[in-house]
């Protein structure tokens, strides 16, 4: 067992040295590499213990677009997107009688949809972190949301013909999301000017209809 651990440790050290090296044009190589274009990007952020890579990756793209179009570096709130996406997924889940997926995952096209419908805010205005929480962890939140939605779906199935669900469950799902992620801001200040999420989206001058998501 000790030999195996030592072997793994040496392997990690070896590969660590390889990947830590600076990549340059080798003096004796016939290949010459030259940077002809550079696309600015915001710093890479951690999604913590959450299934929200789709929000982080898509917003990183739009942050680069803001730098290209407005020459301004703005980090957008991934959790603002996640908060509204969960609500929209919950509504669709009940409307489709539980035949759609209610999970942590998402895709690029969710971001333009949410921004067009709800606007967007800077990351500092909505972190999605509770007091004294330093990193993202959605394990408990998702279990609570999943259990709640299971109860709503069962109630819908138990209704008699002609009966329908009240809208109170929607306030319930919003309450859970607010408890874990925080209430979304209605107004905030950016560079000395007051914005709503919708007016801030307009300020960014990103036309969501200009972007198309393609997958293979």
Show the residue positions of the predicted features:
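Flexible propeptides and autoinhibitory/regulatory segments associated with cysteine proteases
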Residues: 20-216
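Bacterial Sec-dependent N-terminal signal peptides
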Residues: 1-23
